[in-house]
C-alpha cells in the first residue's frame, strides 16, 4: 500500500519536472532551437496542424532557424503563422525554405524572461508540494483505517518528503540552467 502511494507520488513529481522542462523550452533565449517553434500551428486542409508535421525545422546557426516546408503552397501560411505568434520573429521566405533570424534579446527583455521562468519554476514547485500533500493524505487515511502503524506512517511521510526534496532540487537545477542561458549575451 505505502509503496504504491510512494511510487505514484514519485511518477507524478517526475511528470511535473518534465512538464516544467517542456514549458521552459518554449521560452526564447536568443539561441536558435527548433523547439522554439513547437507551439506554432498552421491551417492545412481546414485543420490546425503543428508546424513540425508540415515542415522540417532545424537550427542553421546559433541565431537562425531554417524551416523547409514539405508543400510549396504552405510557405506563405507558415510564414504568416510565425509572424502571428507572440515570439516577435520576422521570417524571410525563399521558395520552400523559410529562414527565421532571431534578434538579440535586450537586457530588459532578458530580465522579463527570467521573471517568467522563475514563475514557471514556482508553479512546478507548487505542483510537487500538492502531490506531496495528496500522498501524505493517502498515508494518513491508511493510518486512520488502522491498516498501518504510526511508525509506518512517519517513515512513509519521511520518504515522501525525500522524494519532494529531490523533485524541488531538480526543478531548481533546471531553473538555474535556463537563467544562465537567458543571461548569456
From Swiss-Prot:
User: Which Pfam families does this one have?
Assistant: RRF
Give the signal peptide as a residue range, or say none if absent: none
Q: Where in the cell is it found?
A: Cytoplasm
At the top level, the lineage of the source is Bacteria
Which UniProt keywords are listed? Cytoplasm, Protein biosynthesis
A GO molecular function annotation here is: ribosomal large subunit binding
Q: Which family does it belong to?
A: Belongs to the RRF family.
The protein's role, per its UniProt record: Responsible for the release of ribosomes from messenger RNA at the termination of protein biosynthesis. May increase the efficiency of translation by recycling ribosomes from one round of translation to another.
Q: State what protein this is by name.
A: Ribosome-recycling factor
* Origin species: Aliivibrio fischeri (strain MJ11)
State the organism's lineage.
Answer: Bacteria, Pseudomonadati, Pseudomonadota, Gammaproteobacteria, Vibrionales
Please name the gene that encodes this protein.
Answer: frr
Amino acid at each position: 500500500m505505502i509503496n504504491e502511494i510512494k511510487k505514484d507520488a514519485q511518477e507524478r513529481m517526475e511528470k511535473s519536472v518534465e512538464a516544467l522542462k517542456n514549458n521552459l523550452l518554449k521560452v526564447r533565449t536568443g539561441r536558435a532551437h527548433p523547439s522554439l517553434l513547437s507551439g506554432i500551428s498552421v491551417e492545412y486542409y481546414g485543420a490546425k496542424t503543428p508546424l513540425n508535421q508540415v515542415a522540417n525545422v532545424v537550427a542553421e546557426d546559433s541565431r537562425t532557424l531554417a524551416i523547409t516546408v514539405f508543400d510549396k503552397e504552405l510557405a506563405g501560411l507558415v510564414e504568416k503563422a510565425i509572424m502571428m505568434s507572440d515570439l516577435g520573429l520576422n521570417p524571410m521566405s525563399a521558395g520552400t525554405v523559410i529562414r527565421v533570424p532571431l534578434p538579440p534579446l535586450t537586457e530588459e527583455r532578458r530580465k522579463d524572461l527570467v521573471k517568467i521562468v522563475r514563475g514557471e519554476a514556482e508553479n512546478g514547485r507548487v505542483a510537487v508540494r500538492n502531490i506531496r500533500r495528496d500522498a501524505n493524505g493517502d498515508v494518513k487515511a491508511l493510518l486512520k483505517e488502522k491498516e498501518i502503524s504510526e511508525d509506518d506512517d512517519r517513515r512513509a511521510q519521511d520518504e515522501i518528503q525525500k522524494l519532494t526534496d529531490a523533485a524541488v532540487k531538480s526543478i531548481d537545477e533546471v531553473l538555474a540552467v535556463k537563467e544562465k542561458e537567458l543571461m548569456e549575451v
